[in-house]
């Protein structure tokens, strides 16, 4: 998390020099991407007049802020580059050196930083911790610093050395009649004690859960249940959750941080590739052999029809529609649903059965391309693949390839098999909101069972699929945009369990993050539909425009920005502007397999309507001002009473009343769980 620093004068000096244009070789190369150039020294050519003016002005500004003089052996160019890197104000852009005629220029890309006097930066620094704290409170997970583990390891090694020294000293003064067997027994007991002490120090967090009745889902083994079997399915991006694998976890996952996602280097940024073993995702359950499909052999019982993943496919289509509307392109013809399933990157190639009919794809990873604040031309390379990202005109080429060693498995009948492992990466939405009135792609199925199938394909947040004997002391992992969250102390878990036990309205929080869909209405007219792939979002209005070096001008993928559009009425425009200005802090929304949870960051009243409260189903409830977690939608209650609303409504500006129509309220937000949005 970036914090305020004392080097803001450096950024102010650079921005003033770039905007004024009074120095030779200093200017914006791409202002939207924050890439600028400064003069570089070419020792083979005669430097033009005024080459050193920029660096002399930089040294003068440095003296004015009380910094010491540079050594005689250092130049202004070297001091400028060193200060940029140490203050983390900019980094070198590749290629670093370009030429303007015969003169050399150095390229830098500015790193966005928070500013003390900027209200938007304050909002940015408030929203991300609020999101993380809400996730910690809901799931009873607290961040774990690796330094604590390193300290525990060093402490255990130090104690081990002390015990070894004491044992040698005792052996030196012992009588010669001591038998070798006794020494071996003493040494064995000492090593067992050391090993036990070390394990107690290293795994105290993982074994410290006490609220087993509330968090028992974190410790139970997954039960295979067809398409939703967590032993064979990856996540529909729960960005915090580890990829489940029947093999041992190879290492922590790496996810782009919000700051990294907003620093493109050119073209479409590369999607994030998770460094995990895909072979582990395809490993069969315990007691089953890994045999490929064949026309003669039986079809495994855990394979279901492709219709089970239709809700997920519709959500992916909606996300791509939202992405294409943001970059100003039309949605291509999707064609047959089979085009949505990508080919595998297998060295043997696809396995064809009789008739060349398509079968089941055991692991599919759909990666919607992230894009910068402005629309870019396609053609950026995909990270880790060495290939260029194709044009968005063909949807099938957008889909990533799997790493299955057998390739796509085929079967008879020409029916498409089930997608057993699907992974979707979050898309970074640009600062400009999508065009009002964007159409939403509907689905063509009616079965309510697909809602459960959609949720079942998402694995639990906190589970390591290791051996049964190692499950009790397994390191509980939980990732959220690159932040490693693990159980830290026992008292913290106890306090969270006690807090949730007192909240009668929140008796179940679930164990899976489920994507959300947000519909935005201004005076009864729908202006935007936001498709989320993270399971946790911050809904807020756009912050005021500022210089591109401000961190508030970056839009992380977990943020849903309300567009600023004009209304036909002058009074309505004024009311809408006032409402959006007061909604800059926003509301945090978390979707799980048990419902939708809200936490308001606002300082003025807001109201929501949902079915979570048994006594106030369909009635207005005020959103708490104390950053308190409130449940707005309950999945189990909706399943028992399906005639109710499928979403939670959030009203801004006016208190909802039955005597007013929708066009009376400035802003109304409908928040859906993705499977309920695509169900009808």
Curated annotation (Swiss-Prot):
Coiled coil: none annotated. Keywords: DNA-binding, Host cytoplasm, Host nucleus, Host-virus interaction, Inhibition of host innate immune response by virus, Inhibition of host interferon signaling pathway by virus, Inhibition of host IRF3 by virus, Inhibition of host PKR by virus, Inhibition of host RLR pathway by virus, Interferon antiviral system evasion, Modulation of host cell apoptosis by virus, Transcription, Transcription regulation, Viral immunoevasion. It comes from the Viruses. GO terms for biological process: symbiont-mediated perturbation of host apoptosis; symbiont-mediated suppression of host cytoplasmic pattern recognition receptor signaling pathway via inhibition of IRF3 activity; symbiont-mediated suppression of host PKR/eIFalpha signaling; symbiont-mediated suppression of host type I interferon-mediated signaling pathway. One of its GO terms (cellular component) is host cell cytoplasm. Belongs to the IRF family. Interacts with host EIF2AK2/PKR. Interacts with host USP7. This is Viral IRF2-like protein. The gene is vIRF-2.
